[in-house]
């Protein structure tokens, strides 16, 4: 199996004081122990930089750009970075068009499309509800809450 690591996981891994830090860490370590493929996409790394450098007062981590770059480099070394390919846009377009995905969820739909194009079978996220209804869109992806790993 292979697992796509969502931005919500990276944010918790980066913040040791977050109440879900331990859950995220244990889930990733367990998947690694099992020999599962662990992947991120450029979109997730971009979203991570957004959250990491955003002030704490507006739901960010409040990290410096230097600290953010160090963490991003660690994540890029730990997780396989899936390439952007021309097949992602048509897969995303089919998903949002068929399911009528709108608003902020179009970004989540793109992550599902990345999983489809790269044959990633599972998506690890704290935001399971964001992917409701999209996971079953063929070829499908299993959305996994880290507490269940």
Summary of predicted features, one role per range:
Residues 52-80, 86-88, 92:
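Active-site-proximal, substrate-binding regions of enzyme catalytic domains
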Residues 2, 109-149:
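Acidic, PIN/NYN-like endoribonuclease modules and their adjacent C-terminal/linker elements
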Residues 39-42, 125:
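Short beta-strand segments at enzyme active-site cores
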Residues 30-31, 75, 95, 99, ...:
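Hydrophobic helix-cap positions at the C-terminus of alpha-helices
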Residues 1-40, 57-66, 70, 133, ...:
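Short, well-structured N-terminal submotif of metal-dependent ribonuclease cores
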């Amino acid at each position: 199996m292979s697992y796509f690591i969502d931005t919500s996981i990276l944010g918790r891994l980066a913040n040791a004081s977050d109440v879900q830090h331990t859950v995220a860490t244990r889930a990733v370590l367990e998947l690694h122990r099992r020999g599962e493929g662990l992947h991120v996409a450029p979109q997730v790394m971009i979203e991570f930089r957004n959250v990491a450098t955003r002030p704490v007062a507006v739901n960010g981590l409040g990290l410096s750009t230097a600290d953010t770059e160090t963490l991003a480099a660690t994540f890029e070394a730990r997780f396989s970075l899936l390439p952007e390919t021309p097949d992602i846009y048509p897969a995303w377009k089919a998903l949002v068009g068929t399911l009528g995905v709108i608003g902020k969820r179009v970004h989540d739909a793109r992550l599902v499309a990345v999983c489809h194009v790269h044959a990633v079978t599972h998506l690890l996220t704290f935001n399971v509800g964001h992917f409701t209804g999209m996971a079953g869109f063929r070829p499908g992806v299993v959305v996994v809450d880290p507490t269940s790993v």
